[in-house]
From Swiss-Prot:
Gene3D superfamilies assigned: 1.10.10.200, 3.30.70.980
Gene Ontology annotations for the cellular component aspect, listed alphabetically: cytosol
An example Gene Ontology biological process: regulation of DNA-templated transcription
Main location: cytoplasm
Identification of the protein by name: Probable transcriptional regulatory protein Noc_0137
Family: Belongs to the TACO1 family.
Annotated compartments: Cytoplasm
Pfam (any one): Transcrip_reg
PANTHER family per the UniProt record, alphabetical: TRANSCRIPTIONAL REGULATORY PROTEIN YEBC-RELATED, TRANSLATIONAL ACTIVATOR OF CYTOCHROME C OXIDASE 1
Claim: Cytoplasm is one of the keywords in the record: yes
HAMAP family cross-referenced by the UniProt entry: Transcrip_reg_TACO1
Keyword list, A-Z: Cytoplasm, DNA-binding, Transcription, Transcription regulation
Length: 248
């Protein structure tokens, strides 16, 4: 099965943007704190916390920061009580967008989200207005240099739902959320190191964009991601490899 890389289409420059804004640690700390609050402070029994910790280590977050975030979540240390909230709507060109936030003030957050949607010609919708276009999936991604046969064999045996080879020869392993940790562990133990791995939202349909449309869409997504309360932005925009190359 071939396709456009999920990471290329949704997050191809997200890492660089996070680093530039200095927001990555803040997002990871909030995710660790909320995961620990909801599922407890033991990563062995909390797949969400385990994933958040893995991402924090990959970002070179100091161990002390991770431990403090866990303790804030479990209540062993005082901290801000964040709640999770999701906003949905349509961005430019009819692209469906979901925005996951962690906030201590819903009124502030929704006002900021609505302002960005309006500024870029989009419309913030009601709960469920675009969620039906997305499904929660575990996605484990590998570079084009990876061993496709080995990944496919281990992933399928480990319980993966699908293995997709993209147009650029990168590989995405899809899992149901509850199977994500098991599949990732099997791949890790087989020595197959992933470039990216997380439970995310995968669009069932996509909207193809021309060059200038793609440029505007990416600026819109960046504007959302720059908001302090935003943790993650999902869209069903589809940028071709050619468009990504031109955007640089």
């Amino acid at each position: 099965m071939a396709g456009h890389s999920k990471w290329a289409n949704i997050q191809y420059r997200k890492g660089a943007q996070d680093a530039k804004r200095g927001k990555l640690f803040t997002r990871l700390i909030r995710e660790i704190t909320v995961a620990a609050r909801l599922e407890g402070g033991d990563p062995a029994t909390s797949p969400r916390l385990r994933t958040a910790i893995d991402k924090a280590f990959a970002a070179n977050m100091p161990k002390d920061n991770i431990e403090r975030a866990i303790k804030r979540g479990t209540g062993d240390l005082e901290g801000v009580a964040y709640e999770e909230v999701r906003y949905e709507g349509y961005g430019p060109y009819g692209v469906a967008v979901m925005v996951d936030c962690m906030t201590d003030n819903r009124n502030r957050t929704v006002a900021e989200i609505r302002h960005v949607f309006s500024k870029w010609g989009g419309n913030l919708g009601t709960d469920g207005s675009v969620a039906y276009l997305f499904s929660k999936k575990g996605i484990i991604s590998y570079s084009k240099e990876s061993n496709e046969d080995a990944i496919m064999e281990v992933a399928i045996e480990g319980g993966a739902e699908d293995v997709v080879t993209n147009e650029d020869s990168s590989i995405d392993v899809f899992t149901e959320p509850e199977e994500f940790s098991t599949v990732k562990k099997a791949l890790d133990e087989a020595g197959l190191k992933a470039e990216q791995a997380e439970i995310t939202q995968h669009a069932s349909t996509s909207v193809s964009l021309a060059l200038e449309e793609a440029r505007k869409m990416l600026d819109f997504l960046d504007a959302l991601e720059e908001l302090d309360d935003v943790q993650q932005v999902y869209s069903n925009a589809d940028f071709s490899e050619e468009i990504l190359a031109q955007l640089g």
